[in-house]
Every structure is written in structure tokens, then in C-alpha cells.
């Protein structure tokens, strides 16, 4: 996991599996970093698995970032399917 500020956005780049433990670590980190609404991008092209705890983190970020300010970028078809099945693609941008 890497985090950087770019053009006023928090860009988070991820790789590998996001199981419950890793998702909880991510949530703790983001709760410290996101103290006010700001655009957030999750770069997901190298993510191979997400569990429901990761989906919960995404919902938290979408609410904290503000309306239309959270984007998932680089979703592979299997990962995008998880978000579609959970009905979350309308809550935030998915490309």
C-alpha cells in the first residue's frame, strides 16, 4: 500500500489480496489521514482479491471524501464484478 497527495487528491495504490486483516489495517490508516472531505482515488489494477471488509472501507471512504469524490481506478473484471454484485458501483466512480 502506498499513499501520496497529488493535485489535492489522496492517491492510494494497492496490490495483492485484501483480506479482513489487511482491510482493517487500511481502514485504520485512512481514518488517520482523512480528517476532512477531499478527493480520493484507489488505484486497483494490481489487486487480486477483496473481501467484504474492503468493501466496508470503500463505503467509509466514499462517505468521508464527500459526494462524487471517491474513485476506484484500474479495476480488473473479477474485482469489478464483486463491486457490481454488492451494488456499490453507483455509490462511487469505477473505471
Each model region followed by its residue ranges:
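Amphipathic alpha-helical interaction surfaces in cytosolic regulatory modules
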Residues: 20-92
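STAS-typified acidic loop motif
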Residues: 1-28, 46
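Short beta->alpha connector loops at strand-helix junctions that form conserved
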Residues: 95
